[in-house]
A protein has these predicted regions:
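Acidic, PIN/NYN-like endoribonuclease modules and their adjacent C-terminal/linker elements
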Residues: 1-19, 30-31, 37-40, 58-86
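Short secondary-structure boundary micro-motifs
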Residues: 21, 32-33, 52-53
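A local structural motif
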Residues: 25-27
Length: 86
């Protein structure tokens, strides 16, 4: 299974690779400044799962029917807060 990580999530690469996933980052594809549309099209062309934390990019991916995992940063912040509040 191939995964394309959006720029802010590059740090997840080694963790996902340790689970056996084939990971490509926007940075490695020299698409760090690419428009969201280009990233979505690249993920569709390569039959990759597009992983992003960007709401606009996620909406665009849904419109194009791309395989998508949208990481909601507000939800993630709440999880961290709840863990720290214990």
């Amino acid at each position: 299974m191939k995964i394309l990580l959006d720029q802010p999530l590059n740090g997840m690469k080694m963790y996902l690779e340790s689970y056996g996933y084939e990971i490509v980052t926007a940075y490695e594809k020299k698409m760090t400044q690419a428009a969201d549309d280009d990233l979505v099209k690249a993920s569709i062309k390569e039959d990759s799962i597009f992983v992003t934390n960007d709401n606009k990019a996620a909406k665009l991916a849904r419109m194009h029917g791309a395989k998508l995992i949208h990481i909601d940063m507000a939800f993630l912040a709440k999880v961290i807060h709840n863990e720290l509040s214990k």
